[in-house]
Structure formats: C-alpha cells, structure tokens
C-alpha cells in the first residue's frame, strides 16, 4: 500500500511542475524588445528630471528633498 502511495505521490510531483511552469516563449526574459518598451523613462514624465534630487518647477526647490545648490542655481 505504501509503495503505491509513494509512486502516486512521485508521479503527481513530477507532473505538476511541468504543467505549472510557463513555456519558454511566455517568459519576459526571452523578449528583450518588449521589456525595453515597458521601461518607464523620464521623457514620459516631465516633472521628473534625470539628475538625482532635482525638482521641477523651480518653486519646488525650497523643499527639503531638493538639493538647491545642484538644481536651482542655474534657474
């Protein structure tokens, strides 16, 4: 009885992961072009500057998070 149960358990454990895993074509790692298109860039968000700790528009430069010496000096 125990050997039959062990065989059944082994079969179930071997079959379940094979059907539960996505196929190779469905994995986003295999589609770099689509992955790059989904990338969020600063061109889509005009209030975000690429420079770290910078804020726009200039009136926000008085915020504590903004670094005025780097961002607002030239404005």
From Swiss-Prot:
> Per its UniProt entry, which superkingdom is the organism in?
Eukaryota
Q: Name the tissues where it is expressed.
A: Expressed by the venom duct.
Pull one GO CC term from this UniProt entry.
extracellular region
Positions carrying Alanine amide: 73
- A Gene Ontology molecular-function term? sodium channel inhibitor activity
Give disulfide pairs as residue numbers.
54-66, 55-71, 61-72
Return the InterPro entries for the record. Answer: Conotoxin_mu-typ
Post-translational modification note: Hydroxylated; hydroxylations improve the ability to block Nav1.4/SCN4A sodium channels but does not affect folding.
Q: What is the effect of changing residue 53 to N?
A: Increase in activity on Nav channel from eel electric membranes, and decrease in binding to rat Nav1.4/SCN4A by increasing the rate of dissociation from rat Nav1.4/SCN4A channel and decreasing the rate of association
User: So what does mutating residue 59 to Q actually do?
Assistant: Important decrease in activity on Nav channel from eel electric membranes, and decrease in binding to rat Nav1.4/SCN4A by increasing the rate of dissociation from rat Nav1.4/SCN4A channel and potently decreasing the rate of association
Locate the site labelled Important for binding sodium channel: 64
Among its keywords, does the record have Signal? yes
| Entry's free-text remark on domains | The cysteine framework is III (CC-C-C-CC).
Q: What does this protein do?
A: Mu-conotoxins block voltage-gated sodium channels (Nav). This toxin potently blocks rat Nav1.4/SCN4A (IC(50)= 19-110 nM). It also moderately blocks rNav1.1/SCN1A (Kd=260 nM), rNav1.2/SCN2A (IC(50)=2.7-17.8 uM), and mNav1.6/SCN8A (IC(50)=680 nM). The inhibition is reversible. In vivo, induces paralysis to an isolated skeletal muscle preparation from frog (cutaneous pectoralis) within a few minutes.
UniProt lists the family membership as follows:
Belongs to the conotoxin M superfamily.
Question: Could you identify this protein by its name?
Answer: Mu-conotoxin GIIIA
């Amino acid at each position: 009885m125990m050997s039959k149960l062990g065989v059944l358990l082994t079969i179930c454990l071997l079959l379940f992961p094979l059907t539960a895993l996505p196929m190779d074509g469905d994995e986003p790692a295999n589609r770099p072009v689509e992955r790059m298109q989904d990338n969020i860039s600063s061109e889509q968000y005009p209030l975000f500057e690429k420079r770290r700790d910078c804020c726009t528009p200039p009136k926000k430069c008085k915020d504590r998070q903004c670094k005025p010496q780097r961002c607002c000096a030239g404005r």
